[in-house]
């Protein structure tokens, strides 16, 4: 009986810890992070873009899933090679922010590639992108081809 009482007390004392702090959801913060991300991305500001992520962040693309700061940084190094600031036109055609979710649709034309349709979805918690997905229809631009407007 004594062992049962000790076990019960231990469960009550240690098993009933206070509820873990829930992340705050602030739509204004979500919008601010999205705005910062878009601005720094379009300027090819790698350090600025990386400020939006944490070591726990995940970026999912059709080709690969990037986990943590080093892998996500590697993705953006490649993205900046595909989307150089010189000669690239990028247009966000839709932007939606609801609670902790940001969603964008965009298109871009570079000297060598056309992003006919691209989309990203972001989950933002406590001012950081914790999850992001990207998908797009990307085709090469030939010397004789006029990019789609």
Predicted regions and their residues:
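Hydrophobic/anchoring residues in structured secondary elements
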Residues: 59, 95-97, 134
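Hydrophobic pocket/interface hotspot
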Residues: 37, 49-50, 57, 68, ...
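Surface-exposed, charged secondary-structure patches
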Residues: 74-115
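A short gly/proline-enriched turn/hairpin at secondary-structure junctions
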Residues: 56-67, 81-86
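Short beta-strand segments enriched in hydrophobic/aromatic residues
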Residues: 53, 106-110, 136
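Short, low-complexity N-terminal intrinsically disordered segments enriched in polar/charged residues
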Residues: 16-51, 143-149
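Short beta-strand edge/turn micro-motifs at domain boundaries
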Residues: 117-146
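Sec-dependent N-terminal signal peptides
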Residues: 4-13
């Amino acid at each position: 009986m004594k062992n049962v009482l000790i076990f019960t007390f231990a469960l009550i004392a240690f098993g009933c810890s206070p509820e873990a702090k829930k992340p705050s959801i602030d739509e204004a913060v979500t919008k601010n992070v999205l705005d910062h991300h878009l601005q720094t991305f379009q300027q090819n500001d790698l350090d600025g873009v990386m400020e939006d992520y944490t070591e726990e962040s995940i970026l999912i693309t059709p080709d690969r899933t990037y986990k943590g700061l080093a892998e996500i940084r590697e993705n953006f190094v490649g993205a900046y090679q595909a989307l150089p600031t010189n000669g690239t036109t990028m247009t966000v055609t839709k932007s939606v922010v609801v609670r902790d979710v940001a969603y964008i649709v965009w298109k871009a034309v570079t000297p060598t590639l056309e992003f006919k349709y691209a989309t990203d979805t972001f989950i933002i918690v406590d001012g950081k992108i914790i999850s992001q997905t990207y998908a797009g229809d990307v085709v090469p631009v030939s010397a004789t081809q006029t990019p789609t407007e």
